[in-house]
């Protein structure tokens, strides 16, 4: 999975 990927959001910001 790419950096910042979570099951909740495509990008963790």
Swiss-Prot record:
Tissue distribution of the protein: Expressed by the skin glands.
Main location: secreted
Compartments (UniProt record): Secreted
Entry GO CC: extracellular region
Keywords: Amphibian defense peptide, G-protein coupled receptor impairing toxin, Secreted, Toxin, Vasoactive, Vasodilator
Disulfide bonds: none
Gene Ontology MF term list: hormone activity; toxin activity
Top-level taxon of the source organism: Eukaryota
Biological processes per GO annotation: defense response; vasodilation
Family: Belongs to the bradykinin-related peptide family.
Biological function: Produces in vitro relaxation of rat arterial smooth muscle and constriction of intestinal smooth muscle. May target bradykinin receptors (BDKRB).
Official protein name in the record: [Ala1,Thr6]-bradykinyl-Ser,Lys,Ala,Val
Organism: Physalaemus signifer (Girard's dwarf frog)
């Amino acid at each position: 999975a790419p950096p910042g990927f979570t099951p909740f959001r495509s990008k963790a910001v």
